[in-house]
Every structure is written in structure tokens, then in C-alpha cells.
UniProtKB/Swiss-Prot annotation:
Pfam name, any one: Cobl
Biased composition (Polar residues): 324-335, 552-573, 773-789, 1105-1122
Function: Plays an important role in the reorganization of the actin cytoskeleton. Binds to and sequesters actin monomers (G actin). Nucleates actin polymerization by assembling three actin monomers in cross-filament orientation and thereby promotes growth of actin filaments at the barbed end. Can also mediate actin depolymerization at barbed ends and severing of actin filaments. Promotes formation of cell ruffles. Regulates neuron morphogenesis and increases branching of axons and dendrites.
Cellular localization per UniProt: Cell membrane; Cytoplasm, Cytoskeleton; Cell projection, Ruffle; Cytoplasm
Motif KKRRAP 2: chain residues: 338-343
Leader peptide range in chain numbering: none
Name of the featured protein: Protein cordon-bleu
Record lineage: Eukaryota, Metazoa, Chordata, Craniata, Vertebrata
UniProt organism field: Danio rerio (Zebrafish)
PROSITE patterns with a match to the protein in the record: WH2
Bias kind Low complexity: ranges: 406-422
Stretches with biased composition (Basic and acidic residues): 390-400, 445-460, 746-757, 1128-1137
Length: 1343
């Protein structure tokens, strides 16, 4: 209640609602059910009772079976008829599924019934059981109706509308017309059926679709087409094709673009006629004065695409009357209908220019603005090219009718077109003259080749209404050529052509003028169809800058080509970065070009360039012009104007042009016949020259989207271009494509081979390639005439830039200058695999040096075995120290092959095969002495990384060792990683560690100087190869390797250096025992306990696997001095303590890097050394031997120090016991703990004695334990506390106590005694398994 109140308290009313009783469920349902049951009966009694009253209780039924048997039975009247059938069938063994029941009334009439009707309710007297007829079902199925075959017929009508009708393909088309017309809402009387809307092939109405084999047709309603067709323009009458069926052809239905294309083709064919009326002189663009409807075959739908009219001219211009007169005088008036009449552009005051004739107004303000600065900055010629593009295009845009005479007839168009082309193509002075017709100024005639008079005549019509028909015949011929060239326009519209045009702008105008006039004539014809060719929708493009007439566009293109040629070489400076050089962009980009003020008409002129090549005369003149340009270019390179050229100002297309032209490994030939290619070469040379002075950063900016060239850094003024070329080229070369023996600056080599493992080797390659590049550049210089010295540089730079894997930081830059985007072609240049010629480094390479070609393949260098190279290796050592293990491995595999060939008799003692076990020590010594320096370098470099000796080694001996040294790569990579750290530590500690470890007799010279004596170097070197090269031999800990590592071998270092070298060689040979026997160890060495312990630990490592070349020489010495006679042990025991500090110094640094070098073995080594030290401290080695020998016996006997075999066996047994004792260690008992306590007490006592007693005795025993296996507890395996045996002190009492304890442990009776032993001294807790020694308080083990 409380909860309910809490929840319902806020809304009190809700609580009342919750308590309201639910609505009663039973009231209505119960009566309804009862009512339903009562209603059918019509009374209070149930229906069953009513029926029962009506039924007869029993019925006498006469039954007739299918077999004819008849009988009479009395049946309960309440049985359903279906049940009756089932009972009868079962009674007479019939299948009710195949039999039916028929009922007959007393009158013998059939009685219809339901299967569930009760027999008593029916008046039945007879029941017939008949077999079911199975065929009745088949009869009942209606016969399948074959559907009428119909197909979907696609009906095209109203140009682009479609309808689908399903019709009978077998019915004749005549019968299908009503259906089609109903669907398309046509009048069947005016309908024509065509196969398609292109060919207008009328179909035979008597044939069916199947006969014709079509499922689609075109329906033409003549009533809809005729009226707009006739009303469009009378000019439509000339096309009989379209009126043949009074229907629009397929080309008509494709809209304005399709129409333009169609007319362009047609106009080309018709323009060839000289004086005949041209159907369409220039179909591509429409006069502004004309509506689209005035064009033939133009449907009203196209009216939406009208060009918006340009602004009305602010003042009347004189150019307009000539155009009107021309149009009046034109023989063909229908041509005018097809051309737009552009309103006269607003007259503008003539720009002030140095030219006398450039009083002509510029049609558009933008053009005028650009035009004025151009003229002011340069000579009339120089100023014109940008202006030319502006003028020509502004004229195109604003006054197509006047300037280009687009509104004139074919003749007028030809004449005026030629004049316009001459206008564009002529130098600025001449173009001003030509432009003058647009203005009041009169053109100044200038002497020109054969075409000039005609051009002047054509130019004059603009200024004067008169037009001479003479030029017309020639114009059609030019047009004919143009038509042919037009077909190839799209192919030749590449960015490089625009660059070529730009190049022409830097050349003299005289030769160009002659070419211009010829080209001008050609361009007149091309003007009619050019713009339309690539740009059918010229209107849309023209909207940006105003109306553009195709002829003007053409004129602006080809004239620019010539104008740029005529213009001074300094003209290119005018070209702005923003101006796009792509002629492919067409009219769409003119707005941006004009905005830059430097429209590059020459770039567009390239569209025509290939067309010019079609004409042999024009081509010949172009080649002559190019020859002169080559001569001029040489001057241009040295001219002051060259400084004006900037990469940014060079047309982007020029660089783009370089992409297809320049091959990575090939030098372009000057033999190229095409003007475009020659021009591209010129452009390239010009570009490289111009960019040199202007790029302070020394970077040539490639507009190819390629990395910038960095050669510019090294470039000097033009006279030195070739030299600069060589240096710059060398600098950029990253990958040697061709290797030729040459020398190169080491600094450049270093740049080139920064990331290469062996810089000297790669430098030689870079040298060779650089020289090759220089040679090729010189070859280019010879070929390229004056321009060649510039061009080879660029090419070589491009080659290297393309092939170089590493790009200098400046190469990542990309110029900000605009570059062509329309039609730009991307070329993926795959450099061929350079033929790598192995060059001998001439002493720069040390044996085993790795040479890597640009393909990443390792090239082996043949070592020169001529004589010992000295003082050359230290630098090489530094380089090698940087080598990665992978590089060293590669060097190994590469050099071993070479070295095998070059191995001399000196290498035989060093041969790694076991066959060379026996050899002369003297010979070995001699070989070591001859080649110790390099060997030490190699071994030290690879292994220790320490500059042990600065002397170069003989290549022959080094080759022998190279094989051994290379074996270091067989070592696991994980250890090689630590070798570098070890090498650093070794370098820091080399002064102390190397000499002290090796020989007591000559420690200072060997260690301090860091340069070992040749013999010692050989020993170290040999040791490393030994450990590296024959790991398998030294791996066996149980065999010779263990004794071989004993510190006694140190004696061998002292007296017999050659013998020690022999030992090393024998180690390589693989028979250490023989070397032991053969070597007389007569020299005494004062071993130091620390040294011996250290040697012991390292010997363990070495025995496990001599995979650690990085270990300092201290470790190597035990490896080298493998088998000293055991008789010298006493001497070792007698070793003076004062020498210990020295050894301690040696041992300390070694320990420092020891863990770093051998991580996996290091732990074992530390464990082993700690255990050994513990054993040594208590002189427990002897006892350990005893225990190992007597696992079952508890007595431990002290073996004599002079018995090496006992020592060896003790160590081996300890090792074995360690593995077996591990199991026992897991289980501990109270007695074992007590035993440990006792041992630790004794151990503590021994620790105190250790400080006082000399350790030299123990070191002797320490080496035998070197195996890297888990620390060997000497006690027998049954001893669970294997640790204690390791700790057992040498004292006799401890031994007896130990034996007693062991017996007690075995019997289990000594536990109490052990507990009773008090711990009075600090003791060490030695864990033999973990190799840890801990000083524990006496209370830790209290019982």
C-alpha cells in the first residue's frame, strides 16, 4: 500500500480509475451464442433435435454393386452418405477412391445429395455403387488455346519520340498502320513508314514484319513536317534529300551539333570550287545578325542556342561598309543566309604603338589593352604576337562578318579570309597594315613572295568595298589543301605544336614572311572549317569572349605561327604564365588568354603546322627557316634577350612537347624532317638556355609536371653550357644507365650515393653514367648545331630525372606557370633496363665491397690481387661499419664467388674445409703477415666494428678471409642487430679489453693503439671467421671445443703468434684436436682469475655457437688458443694477483657488452659465470667432478689439479647433472632447505676466504664449464638441491658435512639435524638453475 500510495499519490484521480472494475465480458457473448444456436432451428429446441425428428431412424436400402450383385440392407438413417459409401466398399472389398455412390428415389429418379447429407433425410430407396471413370478428368480439361503470336514493335516518330505497339509479325504492314497511327495519334492517310530515320528507306506495306526482318520502324507524318520545312527559309530548297520525303533527315534531328558537323563536311567539299557559290563558306559559326532559323536544315528547336548579340559598337566604323559591300557583291546570296553577320565592334582609338600602321582600333577593349603594352614593350613585331592573338580573336569574337568577311560569299570569304590570315600572319607592321582596313588607316604593302599581291588585294576589300576576284581561284586551292589538312588537325593538335609556334616567335621575320604568305593562303581555306572541326559548338565557346568566326580563328592560329616567327626572339617574354599554350582549348580559353594580355596565337598556329608539312613547298621553306632559326638560336643563346626568357614565360606546351619527343635513354636526332620536331628541339634548347640565367635556385622548372631540374645549380653563363652540362648532369644522375669507366668528383659521388651501402662502388657507376651522359650531350651538341649544347643538357637531365630513383629536394617543385590541360597527352616512359657493365673500382673498392646497380641488383666487384693496398681500408672500414647485415650478407655471397677464383696458396691453410687440418704454421703465419691489415679490417668491420688496424690488406689474403668473414651472415640476424651495440661498446673499451685479454707479454701495444700486431690481428680475424665460418665445429660443447676454450690457451698468444694463427686456421679446418697436439704451448701466460672466468663464460658462448663475431678480441683469444697443455695449470694458479686488476678491467668492459651482444646466450653465460664463480670461490669444482663421476655415491673426491681429464669430465658431468637435477629441484623438502642453509653458511665462509685466497686456481677450472647450456650443478642427479653442490666450499669439513647431509637426505633421518644447525653468518643463496646469488640474512632460514 505504501508503494502504491507513493506511486499514485501525485495524481489522485488516477488512483480512482485504477480501482474501477473492468467491463463485464460474459453478458453479450453468451446470449449471442445461444441465440445463434436457436435461430436456425426456429425454436427453443436444438437443431439436432429438429433434424432427428425429421430423419428416419432406419432406411431399407437396395444396394447394387459394380459386379452386378444386388442386396438389400437396413442402414441407420443418421449415417452420412460418404460414410455409407466407405462402409459398403469396405464390406465388399472395394476401393472407395475408385467408386462413386448414386442414389435413386423410389421412383427410380436420381437423387442429388451432398457427401455429408444424412441418409435418413433423403427419400432414397436404392444405392448404386459404380466405378469411377478416370477419363472424365481429361475430357473436362479445355483444349489448349494457342496464343496469337505478337511481337513488340518500336515505332519512332517526331524525330525522337518512341512508342511500343504489340502487333502480329505475320500481318502485312498495311494492316498495322491503323494500330500504329492510333498509338501515335497520326492520320493514316498522311503516314509513311520508313525503315529508319536516317536512310528514309520506305517500307513495302504488303510485307509483314517477319518478311522484312525488322522490329522497329520510323513513322513520318507528312502534315507535320511540310509547313515548318517550307517556312524555315528558301535556302532549304537546295537540299533535295530532305524534301524527297518531306521529312527531316536523321542529321536534322541531331540538333545543332550534328547539323554543324554535316555542313562542315559539305562545305569542305564545296569550298574547293573556285568561283561557284559556296553553299556554306563557313558553316561552323553563325553570323550574329543571323538567327539560327535562317540556317538551312535548322529546326525551330535550335533557336534556343542563339548567340547573344555583342554590345553595339559605340561608334560607326568604316570597316562595316566594306563588309556590306562585299556581301552585296558576293555572287551567292544564300551563303550570306548561312553566315552570321556580326555587328561592327565598337570603334576604339588606335593604340599608341611605335608602328605607323598600328593606328587601327582594337575591336575589344581587352584586346586593345593587351595590344598597347605589347607594342610599347617591344618592336612592332614583338608587340604584335600577343596582340595578334588578341586582335584576331577579338575580331573573331566581335566582328566576324567584317574582319573575316564571314558574311561574304565564298569568294569574299576566301579573299577576306586570306587577308585576315595575312593580317594575322604578317609581322606586326604588316598586320597593322592589314588591320588598317578595319580602321581608317590604309595598309602599307610590304614586299612579299608570290602571294603578297593577292593578300593585299584581299586585305584591301576590308578597307574598300571593291573586291578583286583574282585571289579567289587560288584560295579554293588553298582550301583544298586545307580540307586535307583539316582531316589531320585533331591528330596534330598537340601541346608541343603550340610550343613550336612560340619558338617561331623568337626567329627572324623575313623567312617566316615567305612561309607566312603561303601558309596564309592555306589558312584562308582552313579558316572556313577549322574552328568547326574540333569545336562544333563554337557558339558556346565564343560566348566567353564574344562571337568568333572560324576563319578568324584559323587566321589567328596560322598567322600567329608566322607572326611569332617574324617577331623578335625577345617576344616570348610577353607570354604570361597564365596564357595557356594549348591550341586544343580552342575558343573556350580565349577569355583567359586575353586576360593575360599575351595570347599566344603561335600556339594555335601549330594546329596548322602539320598541315603545312603536307605542302612540300611550305615544308621546304619551313626547314629553311628552321635552319636559319638554328643559326639565330646560337646568337639568341648569347643574346641579352635570352635573359628575359623565364621558364614561367615559356609556353607550357613546349615542355609538354618534350614528353613525347624526348626518350629517356635516347638522344634526339636533328635529322627529324618534321618542322614540329625541329622546332621542339629548338624550343627545348631555348628553354634550357633561357632558364639558366633566370633560375637563381638552379632549378629548371619543368612544365611537364616533372620534377624540377637541379642541374642549374652548377650551370654558368652560356659559353660554359657544355661544361655545366657535364657537371650538372653528373650531379643529377642517380641511376647509372650506362656504365663507362670514368672518374668523377667525389663530392658528386657522395651526393649520388648517399643512401647506397657502398658509396665508392656506386660512385664509380655514377661516374661512368655521368661520363656517358656527357658524351651523349656532346654528341647532341654536334648534332644540334648552335642549339645543341643547350639541348643535350636538358635531355640528359630529363633522362636522369626520369631514371633516378632519388629526387633532389628541389626536384619536387612544380612551376606555377599555366600549362595546357586540353588535349594534353600523358606519356609513361619506361626506361629500359640499363646494361650494367662491371667496372673495376681501381682500388676504391675493398674486397667484398658490394656494388648495387640501379635495378637493385648486387654487382660483384672483382678484387685486384696485384699488391697489398695500405692505408686505404680505414675509410672503407667506416663505410662498412655502416653496412646493414643484409648488405654484408650480399657482400659475402657476391665476393665469395670472386674470391674462390682469386684464392692463392696462402689461403690454403685458412681453407674452411676439414681437409686442411694439418698444415704448416709458418705458411699460415706468412699468409697472415702478408694480409693481416685488410683481414683485420674486414673482420673488425663486420664483427667488432673496431678500427683495429689502419693497414690495408692484400686482396688475395683478404679474399680468403672474405669467405670466412662472409660466414658471419650465416649467423642469425637477431644477433647481428646486437653486434652493432657490441661494436660501439667494444670501440669504447677497445683500449683496455683487446690487449689485456689477448697477451700479457704485449698488452700495451696491442690494446692502446687499437692496432693489433699482424699476428694478433690475424688471430682476431681468424677467430671471427672461425666462430662465424664453422659454427658447426664449435657447436659441440662436449667435445674439443670445451677444452679448447680454456684460459690456458692464453699462453699461445704470448709466445707463438704464428702457432696461434695456425690454431685459428685449424679451427676453420674443423680439427681442433690436431691443432692442439701440433702446437707446442711452451710459453707461460699469467692468467688472471677474472680473465679466466670471463674467458670461461665466453668460451661457453663460443662453444654453443661461434655466431658472435662482434665479441671483442678478449673473447676471441680463448677461441684462438684452443688447446694448451694442462700441465701449465699450476702456472695459472701461480699467476700473480697484481695482474688481476688489469684483467678485472678487461673483464669488466667485456661483461658490459657481453649481455648486449648475446642476449639469448648471455643469460646462460651470466648464470654459468655466477655459478662458476661460486664454485671457484669454494674450490668446489673438484668436488663437482667427483659428484658427477659418482652419482650414486655420496663421497666426493678431490681430483688432482694436474688431471685435465678429471676436470673435463667433472664439467661435463656437472652439465649433465644440471639437466637431470632440474627435475629434482622442483620438489623440495625441509631437509633440503636445511641442507641449503648449511651450504650457504659454508659458502659465506668461503666468500670471506675468496677475497683472501687467490682465484687463479679456480679460473683454470672455469673454462671447462664454458658450454652455454644451463649452468651445470655438479652434484649427482638424485640431489634435489642441486644448488648446494655448486655452492659447496672447498674446505674438508664442509665436504664431510655435505656428505653426511646427503646421506641424511637420502635416508630422511637428517632433517632434524639440519634444522638444528644454527645460522650464524651471512650466507649467499645460490640458485644454480637461475644462476642468481643472493646474500640472505641469517634469520631468513631460522628453524
Amino acid at each position: 500500500m505504501n508503494l502504491g500510495d507513493a506511486t499514485t499519490r501525485p495524481p489522485v484521480g488516477r488512483r480512482m480509475k485504477a480501482q474501477a472494475p473492468p467491463p463485464p465480458r460474459p453478458p453479450q457473448p453468451a446470449p449471442r451464442r445461444i441465440f445463434r444456436n436457436a435461430v436456425p432451428d426456429g425454436g427453443g429446441s436444438s437443431g439436432g433435435d429438429c433434424k432427428e425428428n425429421m430423419l428416419r431412424s432406419y432406411v431399407d436400402l437396395h444396394i447394387s454393386l459394380p459386379t452386378g450383385y444386388q442386396t438389400t440392407i437396413n442402414v441407420d438413417g443418421r449415417k452420412a452418405l460418404m460414410d455409407l459409401l466407405v462402409d459398403l466398399c469396405s464390406q465388399y472389398h472395394l476401393n472407395p477412391a475408385y467408386h462413386t455412390l448414386e442414389l435413386l428415389s423410389p421412383d427410380a429418379q436420381p437423387v442429388s445429395f451432398k457427401p455429408n447429407a444424412l441418409l435418413g433425410a433423403l427419400d432414397v430407396s436404392c444405392a448404386l455403387i459404380k466405378e469411377r471413370v478416370l477419363e472424365d478428368r481429361v475430357i473436362r480439361k479445355p483444349p489448349p488455346k494457342v496464343p496469337e503470336k505478337t511481337v513488340r514493335l518500336v515505332v519512332n516518330y517526331h524525330r525522337s519520340q518512341k512508342a511500343v505497339v504489340r502487333v502480329n509479325p505475320l500481318a502485312p504492314l498495311q494492316t498495322l498502320v491503323p494500330v500504329i497511327c492510333q498509338k501515335c495519334e497520326f492520320d493514316p492517310a498522311h503516314v509513311l513508314l520508313f525503315k529508319d530515320n536516317i536512310n528514309h528507306q520506305q517500307l513495302d506495306l504488303d510485307k509483314s514484319l517477319s518478311d522484312l526482318g525488322i522490329r522497329e520502324l520510323y513513322v513520318l507524318d507528312q502534315t507535320l513536317v511540310l509547313q515548318p520545312k517550307m517556312a524555315s527559309t528558301p535556302a532549304l530548297n537546295y537540299s533535295a534529300e530532305s524534301l524527297r520525303s518531306n521529312s527531316l533527315s536523321g542529321s536534322e534531328k541531331k540538333g545543332l551539333l550534328g547539323f554543324l558537323k554535316f555542313n562542315r563536311r559539305k562545305s569542305k567539299g564545296m569550298s574547293v570550287v573556285a568561283s561557284g557559290p559556296c553553299v556554306e563558306a563557313r558553316p561552323s559559326t553563325l553570323g550574329q545578325s543571323q538567327s539560327v532559323m535562317n540556317i538551312s536544315k535548322m529546326s525551330p528547336k535550335v533557336e534556343l542556342k542563339k548567340r547573344r548579340a555583342p554590345a553595339p559598337p559605340p561608334a560607326p566604323t568604316q570597316t562595316l561598309p566594306p563588309t556590306s559591300q562585299i556581301s552585296l557583291g558576293s555572287p551567292s546570296s544564300h551563303n550570306l543566309l548561312k553566315k552570321r553577320k556580326a555587328p561592327a565592334p565598337p570603334p576604339t582609338p588606335p593604340p599608341s604603338t611605335p608602328e605607323p600602321d598600328i593606328s587601327t582600333y582594337v575591336p575589344t577593349a581587352t584586346v586593345q589593352e593587351h595590344y598597347i603594352p605589347a607594342s610599347v614593350e617591344r618592336t612592332p613585331r614583338a608587340s604584335t604576337p600577343a596582340d595578334d592573338s588578341d586582335l584576331s580573336h577579338s575580331i573573331e569574337d566581335s566582328e566576324p562578318a567584317r574582319s573575316i568577311c564571314s558574311s561574304s560569299s565564298g569568294d569574299d570569304a576566301a579573299a577576306v579570309g586570306s587577308s585576315s590570315s595575312s593580317l594575322a600572319e604578317e609581322p606586326v607592321t604588316h598586320r597593322a597594315d592589314v588591320i588598317a582596313p578595319f580602321t581608317t588607316s590604309t595598309p602599307e604593302p610590304e614586299p612579299k613572295p608570290e602571294y603578297e599581291p593577292e593578300l593585299k588585294k584581299e586585305a584591301s576589300p576590308r578597307s574598300t568595298p571593291e573586291l578583286e576576284p583574282g585571289p579567289r581561284p587560288e584560295v579554293p586551292a588553298a582550301e583544298d589543301l586545307e580540307v586535307e589538312m583539316e582531316l589531320k588537325m585533331e591528330e596534330t593538335e598537340n601541346n608541343r605544336h603550340s610550343g613550336i609556334a612560340w619558338l617561331h616567335s623568337a626567329h627572324e621575320s623575313v623567312l617566316e614572311r615567305r612561309v607566312q604568305q603561303e601558309v596564309e593562303t592555306v589558312s584562308v581555306a582552313s579558316s572556313e572549317s577549322f574552328a568547326d572541326h574540333g569545336y562544333a559548338a563554337s557558339e558556346d565557346m565564343a560566348e566567353e569572349s564574344g562571337p568568333v568566326s572560324p576563319s578568324e580563328r584559323m587566321q589567328s592560329v596560322s598567322p600567329m605561327d608566322i607572326m611569332s616567327l617574324n617577331s623578335d626572339s625577345t617576344l616570348p617574354v610577353k607570354q604570361s604564365k597564365e596564357s595557356s599554350s594549348d591550341s586544343d582549348e580552342g575558343c573556350a580559353t580565349w577569355g583567359s588568354r586575353q586576360s593575360s594580355g599575351h595570347i599566344q596565337d603561335g600556339q594555335k598556329s601549330i594546329k596548322r603546322q602539320n598541315g603545312y608539312e603536307e605542302d612540300p613547298e611550305i615544308t621546304a621553306q619551313i626547314h629553311l627557316t628552321l635552319a636559319d632559326l638554328d643559326a639565330n638560336l646560337a646568337d639568341l643563346n648569347h643574346s641579352d634577350g635570352a635573359s628575359v626568357f623565364v621558364d614561367d614565360e615559356i609556353p607550357v606546351s613546349i615542355v609538354d612537347m618534350d614528353i613525347p619527343v624526348t626518350a629517356i635513354d635516347e638522344v634526339l636526332d636533328d635529322d627529324q624532317c618534321s618542322a614540329s620536331e625541329c622546332e621542339s628541339v629548338l624550343l627545348r634548347s631555348t628553354q634550357s638556355i633561357s632558364s639558366k640565367p633566370c633560375t637563381p635556385c638552379g632549378v629548371i622548372q619543368n612544365k611537364n609536371n616533372n620534377a624540377c631540374l637541379t642541374e642549374e645549380k652548377h650551370r654558368s653563363p652560356f659559353p660554359d653550357i657544355e661544361k655545366q652540362l657535364q657537371t650538372a648532369t653528373l650531379t643529377v644522375i642517380d641511376k647509372p644507365t650506362i656504365q663507362s669507366p670514368t672518374s668523377k668528383k667525389p663530392s658528386q659521388d657522395a651526393k649520388i650515393t648517399d643512401n647506397m651501402e657502398q658509396k665508392t662502388t656506386f660512385n664509380s657507376e655514377a661516374k661512368s653514367k655521368s661520363e656517358t651522359v656527357e658524351l651523349t650531350s656532346q654528341k647532341d651538341t654536334v648534332l644540334q648545331k648552335s642549339q645543341s649544347f643547350v639541348r643535350p643538357d636538358v635531355q640528359s637531365v630529363q633522362k636522369e630525372r626520369t631514371s633516378s630513383t632519388r629526387v633532389l629536394p628541389t626536384q619536387g617543385k612544380i612551376t606555377l606557370s599555366s600549362f595546357s590541360r586540353f588535349g594534353m597527352k600523358t606519356f609513361t616512359v619506361i626506361p629500359p633496363k640499363p646494361a650494367v657493365s662491371q667496372t673495376k673500382p681501381a682500388g676504391s673498392l675493398v674486397t667484398g665491397a658490394i656494388k648495387i646497380d640501379e635495378q637493385g641488383n648486387m654487382v660483384t666487384q672483382r678484387q685486384i690481387s696485384s699488391g697489398p693496398e695500405k692505408n686505404n681500408t680505414p675509410s672503407v672500414d667506416t663505410t662498412r661499419a655502416d653496412k646493414t647485415p643484409l648488405v654484408k650478407a650480399k657482400a659475402f655471397w657476391s665476393t665469395t664467388e670472386k674470391q674462390e677464383k682469386l684464392t692463392t696458396a696462402k689461403t690454403e691453410p685458412i681453407v674452411n674445409n676439414g681437409d686442411t687440418d694439418v698444415f704448416k704454421a709458418s705458411a699460415v703465419t706468412g699468409s697472415f703477415k702478408l694480409s693481416p691489415p685488410e683481414e683485420t679490417h674486414k673482420e673488425v668491420i663486420i664483427v667488432e666494428r673496431k678500427p683495429i688496424s689502419g693497414v690495408a690488406s692484400k686482396p688475395s689474403f683478404s679474399e680468403n678471409h672474405a669467405e670466412k668473414r662472409d660466414l658471419s651472415f650465416l649467423i642469425p640476424s637477431r644477433r647481428t642487430s646486437s653486434q652493432y651495440v657490441a661494436s660501439v661498446i667494444a670501440k669504447n673499451n677497445k683500449n683496455s679489453s683487446i690487449p689485456k685479454t689477448k697477451i700479457d707479454t704485449t698488452p700495451a701495444p696491442l690494446s692502446i693503439s687499437g692496432v693489433q700486431n699482424p699476428v694478433n690481428q690475424l688471430l682476431n680475424n681468424e677467430v671471427k671467421p672461425t666462430s662465424i665460418h664453422k659454427p658447426a665445429v664449435t657447436v659441440k660443447p662436449t667435445e674439443n671445443p670445451v677444452p679448447s676454450f680454456r684460459p690456458k690457451c692464453l699462453q699461445s698468444y704470448v709466445a707463438e703468434k704464428p702457432t696461434s694463427s695456425e690454431r685459428i686456421s685449424t679451427l676453420h679446418g674443423g680439427d681442433k684436436t690436431k691443432s692442439l697436439d701440433s702446437q707446442p704451448l711452451s710459453i707461460k701466460i699469467q692468467p688472471f682469475p677474472h680473465v679466466s672466468a670471463h674467458i670461461k663464460s665466453f668460451s661457453e658462448e663460443a662453444t654453443s655457437i661461434n655466431n658472435f663475431p662482434d665479441t671483442s678480441s678478449a673473447r676471441q683469444t680463448p677461441t684462438d688458443t684452443t688447446h694448451p697443455p694442462l700441465a701449465k695449470k699450476p702456472e695459472l694458479h701461480k699467476s700473480e694477483i697484481p695482474s688481476e686488476p688489469n684483467q678485472g678491467n678487461v673483464f669488466g668492459p667485456v661483461k658490459k657488452f657481453k649481455p648486449v651482444i648475446f642476449k639469448p646466450v648471455q643469460q646462460e653465460t651470466s648464470i654459468h659465470s655466477s655459478l662458476m664463480e661460486a664454485i671457484q670461490s669454494g674450490e668446489g669444482i673438484e668436488r663437482l667432478r667427483k659428484v658427477s663421476d659418482l652419482p650414486t655415491s655420496c663421497t666426493v673426491k678431490k681430483p688432482s689439479y694436474n688431471d685435465p681429464e678429471n676436470e673435463r669430465s667433472a664439467l661435463l658431468s656437472a652439465i649433465r647433472a644440471s639437466s637431470t637435477s632440474a627435475k629434482l629441484k622442483k620438489t623440495k623438502s625441509v631437509a633440503s632447505k636445511e641442507l641449503e642453509q648449511l651450504r650457504k653458511v659454508e659458502e659465506d665462509r668461503n666468500v670471506h676466504t675468496e677475497v683472501i685466497s687467490p682465484r687463479p686456481t679456480s679460473p683454470d677450472f672455469v673454462p671447462p664449464l664454458p658450454p652455454s647450456f644451463s649452468p651445470p650443478p655438479p652434484p649427482p642427479p638424485p640431489l634435489a638441491p642441486a644448488k648446494p653442490p655448486v655452492v659447496l666450499p672447498p674446505g674438508g669439513n664442509p665436504e664431510a658435512a655435505r656428505e653426511a647431509l646427503l646421506e641424511a637426505i637420502r635416508s630422511g633421518s637428517g632433517a632434524q639435524q639440519l634444522r638444528k644447525v644454527p645460522v650464524t653468518q651471512t650466507r649467499r643463496q645460490v640458485n644454480g638453475r637461475l644462476g642468481t646469488i643472493q646474500a640472505t640474512s641469517p634469520l631468513s632460514y631460522g628453524h
